[in-house]
A protein has these predicted regions:
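Membrane-embedded catalytic scaffold of the fatty acid hydroxylase/desaturase
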Residues: 1-105
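Juxtamembrane/interface segments at transmembrane-helix termini
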Residues: 1-5, 28-32, 91-92, 137-141, ...
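Alpha-helical bilayer-embedded segments of polytopic membrane proteins, i.e.
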Residues: 18, 69-81, 105-157
């Protein structure tokens, strides 16, 4: 939790939804799975970030991995695009997230997922196309650039927060 007050945590979670993420899937993926199974192969899905990334010494070493130090940061810039368009829907459709069984999700959470995504898409994609007096490709480019900067920034922050020895 960010705040001692559950009221403020709830407000923040709705803001989280408005930037394209889903607080319910985040809670499962991060709080329940990642913090329970930190860096445990087969459970911590953060170790499965991309096929060209070797995040664990237990993964087979492939030739592409010699380039991961070059490919990682540019690829992490794309992470929020994957998150807002694919990841939350995929996680809600799975019967397991990491080591946690999630056979069904409350209807309320499905509604919140779709409403949150609809608000995000409307605010950050649809409305700029309608109201910004610029070519459509400028609006699209601005959206993609903002998502790339957000993904890159989040990657750097989370990488620095998670670099630990022998875990």
């Amino acid at each position: 939790s960010l705040f001692a007050s559950s009221k403020w945590n709830k407000v923040f979670s709705w803001l989280f939804n408005l930037v394209g993420a889903n607080d319910y899937t985040w809670s499962i993926m991060h709080n329940k799975v990642h913090h329970t199974y930190t860096n445990i192969e087969g459970h911590d899905e953060d170790l499965e970030s991309a096929p060209f990334m070797r995040m664990s010494p237990h993964k087979p070493l492939k030739p592409i991995h010699r380039w991961q130090h070059i490919l990682a940061l540019p690829a992490y810039g794309l992470a929020t695009l994957s998150w807002v368009f694919v990841k939350d829907f995929k996680k809600m459709s799975q019967d397991h997230i990491g080591g946690i069984a999630t056979p069904s999700h409350p209807r309320k959470e499905w509604v919140r997922l779709f409403v949150g995504k609809a608000l995000f898409y409307t605010i950050f994609i649809v409305l700029p196309f309608i109201f910004v007096q610029a070519p459509w490709y400028h609006c699209l480019g601005a959206f993609l650039l903002s998502q790339y900067i957000e993904g890159f920034t989040l990657a750097v922050v989370f990488m620095l927060a998670h670099v630990v020895e022998e875990t």
